[in-house]
Design a protein with these regions (language model features):
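Conserved catalytic alpha/beta cores of large enzymes that bind or transform nucleotide phosphates
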Residues: 38-136, 141-142, 175, 180-191, ...
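Conserved alpha/beta-domain cores
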Residues: 15, 124, 294-544
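Terminal amphipathic helices with adjacent charged low-complexity linkers/tails
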Residues: 61-63, 76-96, 129-172, 261-289, ...
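Short, small-residue-biased leader/transition segments that mark boundaries at the very start
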Residues: 2-3
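Conserved phosphate/anionic-ligand binding catalytic regions in large, soluble enzymes, centered on
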Residues: 11-57, 135-160, 240-245, 315-336, ...
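Short beta-strand segments
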Residues: 9, 38, 273, 309, ...
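Acidic, glycine-rich flexible loop/linker segments
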Residues: 144-145, 151, 155-161, 165, ...
Length: 544
């Protein structure tokens, strides 16, 4: 090369588009079949430093070579309240960059389209394959050409080094009042006193073993972070500086809480729990918890197929190392209650909704979606996909929603669409809702979510199960409604099970067997309905 040769490289104009960070492994559980992507508007420094709460996406790697599938496991809209851009000449006293507030439209929109999310994920897999190890990458989108670029790639240094033969789990035994929540980093629990700092220069005030609470962190904070037992920040995502350093130090952290520095105070005793899935929770007081460690290579093999019961999608990846034969029960209503949070009819009949507070919250939750019903379908499908992905291709049995009317009423907008029942336990629940005009439109959204999960995302290991089906005639009606919504038993390998939890399911077992591919025994309901004993009655507990 001649000494006068000059390399010319294009500047990626992410200042007029977006940028972020990407990992080819799940940063919290070490699950190696997912890609984690964070994204924000403008230059990437804000994401790296944790100065903004970015969008977050998760993608299932094994399906990325199938162009017809969209294996996006999770999409979370971040606040993205500011963006970093290039400063004009003479602005900012010589600084080449500056932060400006984002517009309302930017805050309410995802930075990346589904196609761009998948494109980045494919880049991650290619880079990981090239280097032969999990990778930590930074990316940027050029606002002029619309092209995506990888601007940095380095080895992931935490999860890839963890001993995969041991499984350590934390469980809260009793906790105080929930004070606030954010994104969890790690899976541990810590207790102690709060030390609230606004600047790394306050290092002399920090007490060893305290819980560090601050707005955000940068490299100047590392000496303090090393002395903390846990870390809580107002801002940042799972790929921010605070999250990365906490992970490397083995500390539980909760980032992106929004207002920890306003709600918590010096000397306050709190419990930091990252053991409950994606959302870390700060509880008041010193809670009791237990830690269990299992050497997986010492677990003996069994002749019987052993499957897990799971409800929380966010916690599914924590258990991926277990030698499970699949998921024996995934409760859809848990995903609706904790993920979707909205009554389906409050979305299909939004214009009829009279609760203005509920409408305002629904508007907030459905930001970024062209149709409100898409929010329900996508959120439900993605929540269930995180369970189905963990042990794919082993089966995942998903039970359709089994709320009672009083439980449906607690969903956003639900009270307007649910009748009052004296005994919801044996009232309008399970199969009887699915074909009734009072809920049929809601069940259609559930079916659309299952269809998306199987056909568009690729999780053909999902088996659907119908709860509380009282008669063969009711079974026929439910199967017909499912068929009308694109879920036909036997088509494309589609299997449908039924809960055996009513005496009629046992008495008419042969008739039910003609209509379904399998049974799952619901011992609680079957016992109480056979004996006529309320399972929640303390007085009759000895008879149950």
């Amino acid at each position: 090369v001649c000494s006068s040769d000059l390399g010319v490289q294009m500047m990626v104009r992410s200042d007029i588009s977006g940028s972020g960070v990407m990992f080819s492994i799940d940063t919290e559980s070490g699950f190696d079949k997912t890609v984690l992507i964070n994204a924000a508007w403008g230059l990437g420094e804000n994401v790296v430093q944790g100065a903004v709460d970015p969008d977050e996406y998760q993608v299932y790697k094994p399906f990325l070579d199938k162009p017809k599938l969209t294996p996006i496991l999770a999409k979370s809209l971040g606040a993205k309240e500011k963006k970093m851009i290039y400063a004009r000449a003479g602005h900012g006293h010589g600084s080449p960059i500056r932060n400006v507030p984002t517009s309302k439209a930017e805050r309410e929109a995802f930075v990346l389209s589904d196609a761009e999310i998948l494109e980045l994920a494919r880049y991650a897999v290619t880079i990981e394959t090239h280097y032969g190890q999990p990778m930590d990458m930074e990316w940027a989108k050029d606002g002029e050409s619309g092209l995506l670029y990888i601007v940095q790639a380095r080895p992931e240094t935490v999860q890839s080094r963890i001993d995969t033969h041991a499984l350590k789990s934390y469980r809260l035994k009793k906790a105080g009042v929930k004070l606030l929540e954010g994104l969890s980093v790690g899976e541990a629990i810590a207790t102690g006193e709060v030390c609230l700092l606004h600047s790394a220069a306050e290092i002399e005030r920090f007490v060893d073993g305290a819980i560090l609470v601050t707005s955000t962190t940068d490299p100047d904070w590392v000496p303090i972070m090393k002395r903390a037992s846990a870390i809580i920040t107002d801002h940042g995502g799972r790929t921010s500086h605070a999250a990365i350093v906490s992970r490397e130090l083995g500390l539980p952290a909760i980032v992106g809480t929004g207002n920890a520095t306003h709600l918590l105070h010096d000397g306050q005793e709190v419990t930091v729990s990252c053991a409950e899935g994606d959302h870390g929770i700060v509880y008041e007081g010193i809670a009791e918890f237990e830690v269990e460690e299992v050497e997986l290579h010492e677990v003996p093999p069994t002749k019987t197929r052993v499957m897990l019961n799971l409800a929380n999608p966010a916690a599914a990846a924590r258990w991926w190392r277990l030698p499970s034969d699949g998921v024996g029960l995934a409760r859809m209503e848990f995903v609706i209650n904790n993920g979707v949070r909205v009554h389906p009819l409050a979305l299909t009949r939004y214009d009829q909704l009279t609760d203005e507070a509920a409408k305002a919250e629904i508007d907030r939750l459905t930001r970024g979606y062209a149709r409100r019903t898409d929010y329900f379908v996508d959120t439900l499908a993605m929540g269930l996909s995180r369970i189905a992905a963990t042990w794919y291709p082993n089966p995942t049995i998903v039970r359709m929603s089994d709320f009672k009317t009083n439980e449906y009423a607690e969903l956003l907008g639900g009270r307007q669409f649910e009748p009052h029942e004296e005994n919801p336990m044996i009232g309008w629940r399970g199969a009887s809702r699915y074909y009734a005009e009072g809920y049929k439109a809601g069940f259609a959204l559930e079916c659309q979510a299952i269809r998306k999960l199987r056909d568009e995302m690729g999780f053909d290991n999902v088996i659907v199960m119908i709860p509380f089906c009282r008669s063969p005639d009711e079974a026929d009606r439910v199967l017909e409604v499912m068929r009308e919504n694109g879920l036909e038993r036997g088509k494309g390998g589609m299997q449908v099970y039924v809960m055996c939890e009513i005496p009629s399911n046992v008495v008419l077992a042969e008739e039910f067997a003609k209509r379904f591919d399998g049974f799952s025994i619901g011992s609680n309901d079957l016992t109480q309905l056979t004996l006529g004993v309320d399972r929640d009655s303390g007085t009759l507990a000895g008879l149950f």
